[in-house]
């Protein structure tokens, strides 16, 4: 879409309204880079994300996001093995922690599905293992004492030396107070000193580190603490060295994950942007319009987003597929220009995936481009007149617009002779109409009213004017051409009636009749609009009530199901416990030969009859699993609880099997017996064992952090498993690093006879940090 239309319609100013709701640098960057799209599927996904986030928030509250800064430069330096500061490590930590928090929020969310947002969430890499490594920093970027044992010992020594020095210095301060210019211990050259009067310098033996500007005070380090200060400085050097070592090791550990950290940062930014869209939608009563390719622009209660919400006037604009052109006629200052800009701006915002200030049910056609000639764009440098400037712009628009463009003209044909201007305006509109270019134009030429009446696919419109208040209402009236109110306004302003009467006589009868007809149309239109608004109000109230009732109904059902499931589990647990105890008793009795086998079985069946029954016999998943285990009618089994063989008779509704052991029949759970495999089953299982082993092979192998030999062996094994699993495509993540692992991977792939082709992954999927291979 051309940049000029974005400037004319002040697209960037509207984007700024989303900025305050963003908390991440990545989200702000995504907003800054945002431009209108033409791909319907991409735009619809952006709308679906906002809709899903709205449902998520309604059920689980608003997702809280912390502030993060841009990691681009930090990660670049990390990859170049440049040193990072403590604050930079903290910035990395913030992004990683925020990713973990977002994932946890969605995992714990209840009563809602978010399929569109899951597309983003699935790309989030779990970096929770890195958080522990970064917890050695406080929020200011300083290392905690326990960052390492060595650092803890060094800082303990520093504190001990400082305490000893402070004690000695305090004693000397008290003892030599008369010789000092100030009752204070100060610092010079990173060492504690006393401010000694120049005339008393020989009274305190020590090292002079500085002198006051007047020369009256010498800053002396007493000899009593020189040795201790030397030790203290040595410990501080050791502290800096240890901190440098910790930073270096931490950077080496983070480097293999730089791509994942960068990707998470942008994914977090995207979630942040979705959140900002939702907040805008909720705060401004905005909506997500339906997207069409049928040239419908239908806006209910459309408002311009840059006009104060208390001042803006909402308009219904029906510019559907049956219309090609809308001609807005009438006097200036009535809101024609704002109406044109509103249509253009809301269309651009919708094509950017942003909520628009219009009611639900609005529809937006997706245009390839939008062109506008709005306002006074006279070029002073080119010394063009207003008319010439507009006409130059119009010529360019006519050359570039096609049937999938939207064209907006403000005061078309103005700036020249009225008759010629009107003729040009009609000719331009007719040219665009014949080319099937959707066009909205404003004009004050009355000749265009007739064009709007007699031409197919063209409709007149006007901006309502309140005669009683003598001011425009800024309401758009579709189907009603504009009319002049000059005589009536003049009468109300006190112009003599004789002059008004004489002016009226100059107007032809037909023109007078037309004005009366327009006045009646305006009254009828107002009635229809008012009736339509009342209907929509009732519809909104009904929708809101239906939504609330549905929410309550679903909540009641969820609570009911939860309580039923809870009660069922508790009952089963109680019975299971009692059954186990009973089995133990029966087993003991059986061991003592106190009861006969059939008496034991009868007793146990009676006990098990206490358990609540659940019909598992129709569960397809369980049936499939049982079939895979060989559990079917007639199968031979070994009953472990009795140490006897038996045969499966049938599967009961409670999930247990009726098993026959000789002349005895009983019900047993699957845990109480094992299937005895036939030779044929053993042979079939042997043939398929490799297939089962490889059925869980993932389509991605991560070699980051491995040594060369380890990575080489892992790659060989993985390719074998992928071939056995019949995978078509695999991804090997090797990172960027020094390139050694990457070269090894590509050499292996090049030589392997089962690799058809390979290439680096796309930029958004790892770039040169990952290789995608196609298997033969």
Swiss-Prot record:
Gene3D superfamilies: 3.30.1370.110, P-loop containing nucleotide triphosphate hydrolases (3.40.50.300). One of its GO terms (molecular function) is ATP-dependent DNA damage sensor activity. Belongs to the DNA mismatch repair MutS family. MutS2 subfamily. Residues 701-776 form the Smr domain. GO terms for biological process: mismatch repair; negative regulation of DNA recombination; rescue of stalled ribosome. Transmembrane segments: none annotated. Keywords: ATP-binding, DNA-binding, Endonuclease, Hydrolase, Nuclease, Nucleotide-binding, RNA-binding, rRNA-binding. It comes from Lactococcus lactis subsp. cremoris (strain SK11). This is Endonuclease MutS2.
């Amino acid at each position: 879409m051309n940049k000029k239309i974005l400037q004319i319609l002040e697209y960037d100013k509207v984007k700024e309204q989303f900025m305050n709701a963003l908390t991440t640098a990545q989200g702000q960057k995504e907003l800054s880079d945002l431009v209108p799209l033409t791909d319907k599927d991409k735009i619809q996904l952006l709308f679906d994300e906002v809709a899903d986030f709205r449902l998520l928030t309604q059920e689980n509250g608003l997702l809280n996001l912390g502030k993060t800064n841009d990691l681009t430069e930090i990660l670049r330096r990390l990859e170049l093995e440049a040193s990072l500061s403590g604050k930079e490590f903290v910035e990395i930590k913030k992004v990683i922690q925020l990713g973990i928090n977002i994932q946890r929020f969605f995992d714990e969310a209840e009563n809602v599905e978010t399929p569109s947002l899951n597309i983003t969430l699935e790309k989030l890499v779990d970096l929770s293992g890195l958080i522990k490594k970064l917890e050695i920093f406080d929020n200011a970027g300083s290392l905690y004492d326990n960052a390492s044992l060595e650092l803890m010992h060094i800082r303990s020594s520093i504190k001990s030396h400082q305490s000893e020095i402070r004690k000695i210095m305090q004693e000397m301060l008290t003892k030599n107070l008369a010789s000092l210019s100030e009752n204070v211990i100060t610092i010079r050259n990173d060492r504690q000193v006393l401010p000694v009067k120049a005339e008393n310098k020989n009274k305190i033996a020590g090292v002079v580190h500085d002198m006051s500007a007047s020369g009256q005070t010498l800053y002396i380090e007493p000899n009593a603490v020189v040795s201790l200060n030397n030790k203290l400085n040595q410990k501080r050097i050791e502290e800096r060295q240890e901190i440098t070592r910790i930073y270096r090791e931490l950077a080496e550990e983070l480097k293999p994950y730089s791509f994942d950290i960068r990707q998470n940062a942008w994914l977090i930014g995207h979630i942040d942007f979705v959140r900002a869209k939702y907040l805008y939608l909720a705060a401004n009563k905005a909506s997500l319009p339906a997207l069409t390719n049928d040239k419908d622009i239908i806006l209910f209660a459309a408002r311009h987003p840059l006009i104060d919400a208390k001042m803006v006037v909402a308009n219904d604009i029906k510019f559907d597929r049956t219309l090609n052109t809308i001609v807005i006629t009438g006097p200036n200052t009535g809101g024609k220009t704002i109406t044109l800009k509103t249509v253009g701006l809301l269309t651009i915002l919708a094509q950017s995936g942003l909520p628009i200030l219009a009611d639900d049910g609005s529809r937006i056609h997706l245009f390839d481009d939008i062109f506008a000639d709005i306002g006074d764009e006279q070029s002073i440098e080119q010394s063009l007149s207003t008319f010439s400037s507009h006409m130059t712009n119009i010529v360019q628009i006519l050359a570039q617009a096609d049937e999938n463009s939207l064209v907006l003209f403000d005061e078309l044909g103005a700036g020249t002779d009225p008759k010629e201007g009107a003729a040009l305006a009609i000719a331009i509109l007719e040219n665009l109409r014949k080319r099937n270019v959707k066009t909205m134009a404003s004009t004050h030429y009355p000749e265009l009213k007739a064009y709007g009446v007699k031409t197919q696919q063209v409709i007149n419109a006007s901006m309502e004017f309140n005669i009683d208040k003598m001011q425009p209402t800024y309401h758009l009236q579709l189907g009603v051409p504009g009319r002049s109110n000059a005589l009536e306004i003049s009468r109300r302003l006190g112009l003599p009636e004789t002059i008004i009467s004489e002016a009226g006589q100059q107007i032809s009868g037909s023109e007078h009749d037309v004005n009366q007809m327009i006045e009646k149309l305006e009254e009828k239109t107002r009635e229809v609009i008012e009736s339509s608004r009342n209907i929509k109000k009732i519809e909104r109230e009904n929708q809101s009530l239906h939504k609330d009732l549905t929410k309550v109904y679903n909540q009641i059902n969820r609570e009911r199901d939860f309580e039923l499931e809870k009660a069922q589990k508790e009952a089963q647990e109680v019975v299971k416990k009692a059954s186990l105890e009973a089995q133990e008793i029966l087993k003991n009795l059986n061991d003592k030969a106190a009861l006969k086998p059939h008496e034991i079985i009868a007793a146990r069946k009676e006990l098990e009859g206490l358990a609540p029954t659940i019909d598992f016999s129709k569960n397809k998943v369980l049936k499939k699993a049982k079939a895979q285990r060989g559990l079917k009618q007639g199968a031979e089994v070994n009953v472990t609880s009795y140490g006897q063989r038996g045969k499966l008779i049938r599967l009961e509704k409670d999930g247990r099997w009726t098993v026959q052991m000789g002349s005895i029949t009983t019900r047993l759970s699957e845990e109480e017996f094992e299937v005895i495999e036939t030779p044929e089953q053993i042979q079939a299982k042997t043939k398929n064992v490799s297939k089962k082993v490889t059925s869980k092979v993932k389509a991605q192998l991560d070699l980051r952090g491995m040594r060369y030999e380890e990575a080489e062996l892992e790659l060989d094994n993985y390719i074998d498993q992928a071939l056995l699993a019949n995978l078509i495509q695999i991804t090997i993540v090797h990172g960027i690093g020094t390139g050694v692992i990457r070269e090894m991977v590509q050499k292996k792939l090049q030589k392997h006879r089962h690799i058809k082709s390979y290439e680096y992954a796309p930029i958004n999927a790892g770039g040169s940090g990952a290789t995608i291979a196609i298997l033969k």
